[in-house]
Amino acid sequence: HPFIVTLATQLIVYGILLMYIMLNGNNGQPLSGLDKSFKNFVTGSFLKIRGVPIPNYVWYACVVVVFMWFMWNKTTFGKNMFAVGSNPEAANVSGVNVMRTTILVHTLAGCMYGITGFIESARIGSNQANTGLNYECDAIAACVIGGVSFVGGTGKISGVVLGVFILRIIFVALQFLAVSQNMQYVIKGLIILIACAIDMRKYLVRK
């Protein structure tokens, strides 16, 4: 399953990176003291709304959303992604190159991970090997809340964006209520389980 392979590869690369840093790097210490221009490129603001500065990374996220929406809805590659996710066998019979589409999807995901790492490093002002660890859980939760199906064939970019907003509002509220980080992990897991259960129920009803 692509998700299992991706998760396993992540753990392998993460472990190798930690060993490399411990043996040949800075003993696992965070990299800080990043150039100010690098941080300002991401955390600075060129536009204010009613006097409130909007960080640049918000606009970068908007650009990515528009790009992905266009690719998903207006290109052949987007249609192929949907077809392969829905039913690889049927997509193959219809003339879609399933292997090529799958590789391109993973390549696109890798590019997005790189962009995210670049932005996150500048946003927090430092970087280390475990920066972004467990972000995949946030991504899964946001997508499932936004209507993306684990079995494929269902999902919209607008739904994912809505899921991100809903998830973020939930965790900001939990922080405001002084809920511990450990309990937030529990709540996040429950959100994913409940959303997946609802998704599977819808799938079984359709079947």
List the model feature ranges, each with a label.
Residues 2-4, 54-60, 102, 134-136, ...:
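Loop-to-transmembrane alpha-helix initiation sites
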Residues 22-30, 73, 77, 122-129, ...:
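Transmembrane helix-loop junctions in multipass membrane proteins, especially transporters and channels
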Residues 66-106:
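Membrane-helix/interface signature in polytopic inner-membrane proteins
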Residues 106-107, 113-114, 123-186:
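Transmembrane alpha-helical segments in multi-pass inner-membrane proteins
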